[in-house]
Amino acid sequence: MKHGPDKRKSVSHRLAIVEGHLRKVQSMVKQGAYCIDIIHQSRAIQQALKHFDQQVLAQH
C-alpha cells in the first residue's frame, strides 16, 4: 500500500481484529463449543474482512 502511516495503521488494525476472531474460533472448535456460537464468530470474521476490503478499496 502506498498510503500514509495513519491509513496503513487503520488497515492493519482491521486485520488484527480478523486475527483475533480467527484465534477465538480455533479455540472454540478445540473446546467443542456450540456450533451456533462458532458460526456467530465466523460471521464476525466475514464482516471484519468485508470492512477491510472496503477500507483498502476506498484508499486505492
Model-predicted regions and their roles:
Residues M1-H60:
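Solvent-exposed interaction patches of small proteins and small membrane subunits
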